[in-house]
């Protein structure tokens, strides 16, 4: 049975205790994970603070920090098979996805390596002839990066990459539900040659790990991806120290299909939007809003396509669809699906727990047309359940798309260019995908509105999240200050 360790102040160590990690494909224990408790969390933060001020890190130029990130990116690529296999075993995500996602992880680190020496200040043209002023951007300090189990390597890269590029130090908390990929990633941090304490990797449970980390007075910035309820706890914990908080939370993203679109493209994109990663994605397009005139044809073809999705063991490259991560998640999904059917939703496909080992749940489509209170329409399930509703006008599509407190992502399929522009203006979401879905790039900011959080990841915007500004004034005159009591 595999064993993993924490990484604190440049050294690997056992946790205060151990806990089991379950393989979602089999339901069996496959590894022992280290549990960090209060003392180890405190030591990780102390190490990060000490490293932040130590010349071995603070004395590096921006381009030198970039070189370390370039090396890390190369190591991620070199270790891709191992990292992908661990993520597949620990989370149940299919190897086809974890393998391809590792390439994105390397690209994000490479992008921020190149950006490190391009985080610039600016000259301020003040209206005072005897004064000059300029703006300096400085790293904010110790960053607590808290990520969920799904896509841990990717979701940590979009935090750790810009934080290190900006000159911050990091305590990275891996989800206790599947921490193996990030605990393995710590070995790459060590091999890349980052000074001790610059990046620390821990895992553990909420009360003695996450809560201690988010309330720590030495943490200057908390970057969190996860659910709104946990986010509220983090914000409350951080309030005592007024730490900066950036949140990338969940969503109930609308996937809007107009009758004038290319149906084949929309079908494939909808499959990707909700059934890729078994629906366990913050941007899952879990609400299909379909123009009424094409509903029957679209649903028939979608149901036929869903039946051909190959479910199987996640480590098989032929598998298209794997298990859910936890038994608890499967039980929640089944309860919501059953309740929605009781409320009047029509089951098109799926809806029953799969027989056999592992936490499998079939691709499920619920026709919720005319059942506006169906629970599946309003609940972020984090699973493979598509709720279908119709619209007859553009205004109705917009109203239904925005009828949620979330606002992370949306998809719009139409061949009408002016309509596409109108929809992007009207929809309240941080990302709008037009005639595509689930596309990312290191250059493009990512984030949401409302209960989907605030702050942005990706692009220059993300690096600036980890900086603070300092305004510097210089008096140019040789003349003495004549009146000290007058504001200049």
From Swiss-Prot:
Top enzyme class: oxidoreductase
Pfam families, A to Z: Aldedh
Binding-site positions, NAD(+): 149-150, 226-227, 249, 380
Known EC number: 1.2.1.-
Cited InterPro entries: Ald_DH/histidinol_DH, Ald_DH_C, Ald_DH_CS_CYS, Ald_DH_CS_GLU, Ald_DH_N, Aldehyde_DH_dom
Database matches in SUPFAM superfamilies: ALDH-like (SSF53720)
Keywords: NAD, Oxidoreductase
GO terms for MF: oxidoreductase activity, acting on the aldehyde or oxo group of donors, NAD or NADP as acceptor
Gene3D superfamilies named in the record: Aldehyde Dehydrogenase, Chain A, domain 1, Aldehyde Dehydrogenase, Chain A, domain 2
Gene behind the chain: tgnC
Protein name: (Z)-2-((N-methylformamido)methylene)-5-hydroxybutyrolactone dehydrogenase
Catalytic reactions of this protein: (Z)-2-((N-methylformamido)methylene)-5-hydroxybutanolactone + NAD(+) + H2O = (E)-2-((N-methylformamido) methylene)succinate + NADH + 3 H(+)
Protein family per UniProt: Belongs to the aldehyde dehydrogenase family.
Active-site residues, record numbering mapped to chain: 248, 282
Annotated function: Involved in the degradation of the pyridine ring of trigonelline (TG; N-methylnicotinate) into succinate and methylamine as carbon and nitrogen sources, respectively. Catalyzes the NAD(+)-dependent oxidation of (Z)-2-((N-methylformamido)methylene)-5-hydroxybutyrolactone (MFMB) to yield (E)-2-((N-methylformamido)methylene)succinate (MFMS).
Record text on subunit structure and interactions: Homodimer.
């Amino acid at each position: 049975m595999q064993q993993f360790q924490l990484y604190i102040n440049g050294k690997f160590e056992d946790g205060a205790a151990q806990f089991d990690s379950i393989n979602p494909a089999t339901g069996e224990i496959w590894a022992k994970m280290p549990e960090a408790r209060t003392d180890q969390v405190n030591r990780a933060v102390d190490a990060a603070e000490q490293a932040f001020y130590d010349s071995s890190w603070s004395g590096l130029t921006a381009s030198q920090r970039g070189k370390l990130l370039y090396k890390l990116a190369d190591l991620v690529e070199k270790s891709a098979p191992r990292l992908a296999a661990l993520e597949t075993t620990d989370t149940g995500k299919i190897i086809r996805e974890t393998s391809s996602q590792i390439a994105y992880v390397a690209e994000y680190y490479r992008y921020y390596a190149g950006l490190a020496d391009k985080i610039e200040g600016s000259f301020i043209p003040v209206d005072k002839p005897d004064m000059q002023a300029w703006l300096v951007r400085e790293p904010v300090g110790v960053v607590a990066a808290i990520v969920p189990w799904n896509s841990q390597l990717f979701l940590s890269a979009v935090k750790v990459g810009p934080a290190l590029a900006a000159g911050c130090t990091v305590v990275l908390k891996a989800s206790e539900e599947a921490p193996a990929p990030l605990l393995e990633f710590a070995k790459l941090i060590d091999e890349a040659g980052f000074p001790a304490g610059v990046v620390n990797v821990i895992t553990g449970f909420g009360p003695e790990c996450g809560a201690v980390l988010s309330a720590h007075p030495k943490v200057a910035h908390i970057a969190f991806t996860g659910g709104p309820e946990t986010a509220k706890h983090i914000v409350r914990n951080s309030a005592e120290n007024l730490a900066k908080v950036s949140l990338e939370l969940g969503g109930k993203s609308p996937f809007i299909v107009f009758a004038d679109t290319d149906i084949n493209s929309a079908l494939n994109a909808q499959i990707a939007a909700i059934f890729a990663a078994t629906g366990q994605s913050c941007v899952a397009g879990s609400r299909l809003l379909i123009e009424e005139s094409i509903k029957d044809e679209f649903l028939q073809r979608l149901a036929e396509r869903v039946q051909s999705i190959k479910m199987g063991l996640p480590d098989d490259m032929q598998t298209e669809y794997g298990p859910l991560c936890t038994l608890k998640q499967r039980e929640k999904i089944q309860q919501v699906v059953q309740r929605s059917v009781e409320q009047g939703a029509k089951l098109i496909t799926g809806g029953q727990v799969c027989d056999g080992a592992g936490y499998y749940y079939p691709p499920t489509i619920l026709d919720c047309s005319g059942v506006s209170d169906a629970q599946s329409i309003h609940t972020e399930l984090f699973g493979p359940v598509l709720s279908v509703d119709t619209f007859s006008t553009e205004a109705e599509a917009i109203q239904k798309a925005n009828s949620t407190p979330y606002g992370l992502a949306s998809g719009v399929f139409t061949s009408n260019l002016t309509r596409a522009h109108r929809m992007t203006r009207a929809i309240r979401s941080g990302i709008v995908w037009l005639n595509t879905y689930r596309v990312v790039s290191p250059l493009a900011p990512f984030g949401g509105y409302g209960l989907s959080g605030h702050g942005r990841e990706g692009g220059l915007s993300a690096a600036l999240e980890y900086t603070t500004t300092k305004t510097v004034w210089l008096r140019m005159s040789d003349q003495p200050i004549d009146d000290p009591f007058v504001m200049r």
